[in-house]
């Protein structure tokens, strides 16, 4: 068996990005997962292209920040300001539309590919595998 320690939330902020790079360089973790819709995403992409991140996965998120898809196309996932609902609110909703989740996850994947990232794994948000609309969309994305 092989244990891989992964640093989550690459792209969240520049400070988080620097911490993850430090952990990678120290051998404390082997890979990271990038969030494509966060304030530090562009900085994370630059660090990747500088060779400071050997392996990167995609951290799909539908509970933090703003969607990459126009909010009017994913209304079951966002609040009145166009921000993603937090995980507690989202997981309590009965009317989350699976197709909207799929649309957003695909947008995040395309953004990663368009940024020149070679994605070698992915993770779902907040154990989304236990929430039917996220599980179904994540399985297809």
Segments predicted by a language model, with ranges:
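Alpha-helical scaffold elements lining the catalytic groove of polysaccharide deacetylases
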Residues: 95-109
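Catalytic domains of cell-wall/extracellular-matrix polysaccharide-remodeling enzymes
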Residues: 106-141
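Active-site gating loops and adjacent loop-to-helix segments of metal-dependent hydrolytic enzymes
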Residues: 67-97
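Active-site beta-loop-alpha junctions enriched in small/polar residues
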Residues: 8-10, 35-37, 59-63, 125-127
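Acidic (Asp/Glu)-rich catalytic clusters
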Residues: 20-26, 42-55, 72-79, 113-114
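Structural preference for beta-strand elements that scaffold enzyme active sites
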Residues: 2-4, 29-33, 53-59, 118-123
